[in-house]
Regions:
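Conserved catalytic-core motifs of GNAT/GCN5-like acyltransferases
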Residues: 62-65, 114-115, 127, 132-149
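Conserved GNAT acetyl-CoA-binding A-motif
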Residues: 103-115
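A short beta-loop-alpha structural element at the N-terminal edge
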Residues: 1-14
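Conserved acetyl-CoA-binding loop-helix of GNAT-fold acetyltransferases
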Residues: 88-101, 124-128
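Glycine-rich phosphate/pyrophosphate-binding loop shared by adenosine-nucleotide-utilizing enzymes
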Residues: 1, 56-60, 148
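Acetyl-CoA-dependent GNAT
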Residues: 31-85, 96-97, 156-158
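Conserved GNAT-fold acetyl-CoA-binding loop/helix
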Residues: 15-41
């Protein structure tokens, strides 16, 4: 497996993997994968990566700004998605580890993740990479008519902003 920077030509695979995550009902409140323009404007240009296996994109990770306020320029939110046929192979852990390194190279001091409590594998990957549970955002939004909680996790860099 190879972790590399995202290229625009990866977007078809990235969008498909994103939709697979959406379809689980435990990855995001989104109902449909974003098109190129919306996806491209949602994520920081410098922190977008993919996992490639046998020339196939099997996962992706990217950061989005946590806020548009200047004081929070060093705070970003993690998005990470793995193709359903490649779950439980360590791809998510590899992507998150590389994303952390890239984020620190970009001067980002805090990473945040909002995770459905039912998404145990995502919670485990984030915990393994130094994220701590800050709290639960109760009934943050409705999905299919039911209120959903979000586990709020955060990782503070040990090298940036110390």
């Amino acid at each position: 497996m190879k972790i590399r920077n995202f290229k625009k030509s990866d977007f078809t695979s990235v969008k498909s993997i994103y939709q697979q995550g959406i379809d689980t009902g435990n990855a995001t409140f989104q109902k449909k994968a974003k098109g190129w323009s919306e996806w491209n404007s949602s994520f920081l240009i410098t922190c977008r990566i993919v996992a490639e296996l046998n020339n196939e994109v099997v996962g992706w990770a990217a950061l989005s700004a946590a806020s548009n306020r200047t004081v929070y320029n060093g705070v970003a939110e993690v998005s990470i998605y793995i193709a359903k046929n490649y779950a439980n192979y360590g791809i998510g852990n590899s992507l998150l580890s590389e994303l952390i390194s890239k984020s620190e190279n970009e001067g980002i001091w805090t990473l945040q993740a909002g995770i459905f409590p039912e998404n145990e594998s995502s919670i485990a990957i984030h915990s393994k990479n130094g994220f701590k549970t800050i709290g639960v955002r109760e009934k943050l939004g409705k999905m299919n008519g039911a209120w959903r909680d979000i586990l709020f996790m955060e990782r503070r860099s040990k090298v940036v902003g110390i």
